[in-house]
C-alpha cells in the first residue's frame, strides 16, 4: 500500500460543508448566466502563447503553456460573433501560493459585446447578489467578523479617490516613486469592501495590459476591481480593440519580463489578428475559490478546495 493515512480521509471529511457550499455556488452562478442568455463555452487549457504580462508567469507544458486565463480564446470567440459568453475553468500561474493563492485555481470569466466597464460593474453586482441570495444571504454576509451589507447599490470609487481617502501619498506620487502596488496593498486594499462590497475603478493607464483607455483621459484605463471584506475578488475592463496598440503593449510587457529574466512568450498573433473584427466589449475574471472563502467564512483558500497541492 502507498502512503495512505486515515488523516487524509479525516481532512477531506472536514471539508464536506465547504465543498457542498462551493458546488452550490458554482451551480447558482451558472444558473444566472443561463437565465441571461449567455453561451457557456469551453476553450483549451493548454495554449501555444499566453498574453505577455509583466507580473504573471505561465507554467510550461511541453513547448506550450497552461493558461493563466481563458481571455485570449474567449475574445477570439467574441470577435467571431459570439456576443455573450461565460466560462468556469481551471487556470494556472507559476509561483502563486499563499493563504489566498493557489498555482491551480478556478476562474469565472464572462464577456459581453456592446458593453463598457460601467455596464459590466452593474451586471457583476446583479450576478453576485443573485448568487448570494441562492446561497441564503439576502441582506448581508459575515466574513471574519465583518458584517457586509449586500443591498444594491454597492460602493463605487475611483482609484484616485481611494488614494486620497486612504493613502499617505497621492496616486501621482505613488506612480512617480514606483510604489503604486505597495501603497495599494498596504493602505488601500484593507479598507475596501468593509461595510459593503466596493468596486474601485479608473486605474492608471500603465496598469492596464489589455484594457481600453478612457477617451476623455488617456492616463486612465477603463478597468475596475471588486473587493469584499478587503479581499480582491474580480478584475474587469472595457476591452482594448486596437490591434496596433495591443501589440505595442505586449512588446513593452515582453521587455519588462526580459528585465526580470522571465521567459519571452511567442506573440499571440491569432488573438491580435482577431482584434480587427472585435466589437466594443467588456470582460471580467472572478476568482471562484476566493468567493467560496467568503461564503465559507474562512481566511484560507485550502479550506474550499478538495486537494491543495501539498495534499497530493
What are these regions (language model features)?
Residues 81-83, 137:
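Glycine-centered helix-coil hinge/cap
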Residues 35, 79, 130, 134, ...:
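Residues at alpha-helix termini
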Residues 35-41, 133-142, 294:
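Surface-exposed helix-capping loop/turn segments at secondary-structure junctions
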Residues 121-131:
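Short amphipathic C-terminal alpha-helix that caps PH/PH-like domains
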Residues 133-172:
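Alpha-helical scaffold segments that mediate packing/assembly in large oligomeric complexes
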Residues 28, 44-77, 84-119, 157-312:
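A translation/RNA-centric and nucleic-acid-associated enzymatic feature enriched
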Residues 15-24, 112-118, 142-158:
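Cytochrome P450
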Residues 1-59, 286:
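TRNA-binding/sensing appendages of the translation machinery
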